[in-house]
């Protein structure tokens, strides 16, 4: 069901300062940027991203890539998982928030709409 860890999301109060830290100090590469609210950074040789967001998060968030959010939800509910947030549209597909039987919260998402499109400066374009 899980294909991979798509991303780990961290809250940062200032995206530009966080990008200086993670890019210049830690050497992560910018994959995409959505204005002053979000940016995705490549983690090493993997295609898992560290996503920095200015929106408040209760805790760091782990997002798992699945083939289909709806199919994954059906399976998760059958085996004791809980639906916390109904599926909703995101730029690349669908997303939902779920919880395992031990109250570990995580996100599942699919790429039913494809990858983000970016310009030469890695800014997300529509």
Annotated model-derived regions:
Residues 9, 42, 53, 84, ...:
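Residue-level detector of conserved, well-ordered beta-strand and adjacent loop positions
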Residues 1-19, 47, 60-62, 112-126:
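N-terminal beta-strand motif that seeds the catalytic metal site of vicinal oxygen chelate
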Residues 7-11, 17-42:
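N-terminal first-folded block
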Residues 35-36, 89, 116:
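Residue-level "edge-of-site" marker
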Residues 29-60, 105-111:
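Conserved short beta-strand elements that form part of the metal-binding/catalytic scaffold
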Residues 16-17, 57, 70-71:
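Short alpha-helical
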Residues 2-4, 54-59, 89-90:
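Short glycine-enriched loop/turn motifs at secondary-structure junctions
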Residues 63-105:
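Vicinal oxygen chelate
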């Amino acid at each position: 069901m899980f294909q991979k860890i798509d991303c780990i999301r961290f809250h940062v109060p200032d995206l530009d300062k966080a990008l200086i830290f993670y890019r210049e100090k830690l050497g992560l590469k910018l994959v995409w940027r959505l204005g002053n609210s979000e940016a995705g950074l490549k983690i090493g040789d993997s295609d898992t991203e560290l996503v920095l967001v200015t929106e408040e998060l209760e805790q760091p968030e782990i997002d798992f890539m699945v083939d289909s959010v709806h199919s994954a939800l059906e399976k998760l509910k059958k085996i004791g998982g809980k639906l916390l947030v109904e599926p909703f549209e995101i730029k690349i597909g669908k997303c939902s928030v779920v919880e395992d039987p031990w109250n570990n919260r995580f996100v599942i998402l699919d790429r039913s709409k494809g990858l983000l499109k970016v310009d030469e400066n890695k800014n997300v374009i529509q």
